[in-house]
């Protein structure tokens, strides 16, 4: 799930801040929300000397939005001593400059269905902390080694519109189902 990937990217950054792709995904993700590539990402990533990391460019930026992002990222680096569950919990409960917690940012960007997989990730982190030595790098390695897929029960009724493929909706029931004809050409007068 994309919310889980966003949380794992925060852990990856804390372990290796020089990983430019991970950092770019965090910038565009729900925690920072800098989705305008032309304004944020291209000037930071494209206009840099060879060998200069994206993290270095972010720290040197004078753009107020990038400075706020740098502050959030520095906060992640200050938490590297925490166990994985404590790290994730502190990020999700932290109130940002915009007045929203990490949970609220995930919900606003990805919707309420994103909460279950993120909670499952945090449960995995708590289990990992009790069995293995609590380290961010160890938890990341365990998650990547097991490649576990966290799914949500979609059969539970909710008051929301779900856009799904026919295969994904197989076996589900709803009072209204819309099946658009995506293969026919435009009809005259419509």
Regions found by a protein language model. Name each.
Residues 1, 5-190:
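Conserved helicase C-terminal RecA-like lobe
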């Amino acid at each position: 799930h994309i919310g889980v990937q966003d949380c794992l990217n925060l852990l990856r950054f804390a372990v290796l801040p020089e990983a430019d792709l991970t950092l770019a995904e965090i910038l565009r993700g729900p925690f920072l929300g800098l989705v305008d590539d032309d304004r944020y990402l291209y000037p930071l990533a494209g206009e840099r000397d060879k060998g200069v990391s994206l993290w270095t460019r972010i720290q040197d930026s004078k753009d107020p939005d990038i400075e706020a992002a740098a502050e959030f990222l520095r906060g992640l680096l200050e938490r590297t001593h925490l166990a994985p569950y404590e790290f994730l919990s502190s990020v999700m409960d932290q109130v940002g400059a915009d007045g929203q917690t990490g949970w609220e940012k995930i919900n606003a960007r990805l919707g309420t269905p994103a909460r279950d997989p993120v909670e499952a990730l945090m449960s995995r982190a708590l289990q990992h902390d009790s069995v293995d030595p609590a380290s961010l790098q160890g938890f990341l390695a365990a998650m990547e080694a097991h490649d576990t897929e966290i799914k949500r029960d979609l059969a539970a009724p909710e008051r929301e519109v779900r856009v799904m493929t026919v295969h994904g909706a197989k076996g589900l029931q709803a009072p209204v189902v819309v099946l658009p004809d995506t293969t026919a050409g435009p009809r005259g007068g419509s």
